[in-house]
């Protein structure tokens, strides 16, 4: 499977560590991982130095259709199966990219625990029904997503963003 991680700022905070961990875990399992970003930083440098494919392009809400078209072109060219968006803006662009390349599925992980303004609540109501999966990294994050316009039944909480292997229980 070809997975593209989509993040605006490829810096060095918790979300970036989450993306890097997933890229390491899934590439070790034989998946092909790509990183698409707007603003370079430690994550993009690390990922590039480790040999992962990287794609830098301009992303903004004002130029969402242009960004979506560029993203779709990259996905088509690289036969991307899944776009994993990390924040609301990236999610909107990923969903819009499906207008130009329908084969891709979109997974959205919310790392935010902030209440959004009316504009984003409306955008969440319009766009999140098209996500194939929506992940919150904590219960509070899920509750805030609901208040931000995401339907409760669409959200799955995966603590720390990576589902751990279940330990065998001995009686």
Region locations from a protein language model:
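Membrane-interface segments of envelope glycosyltransferases acting on lipid-linked substrates or membrane lipids
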Residues: 1-171
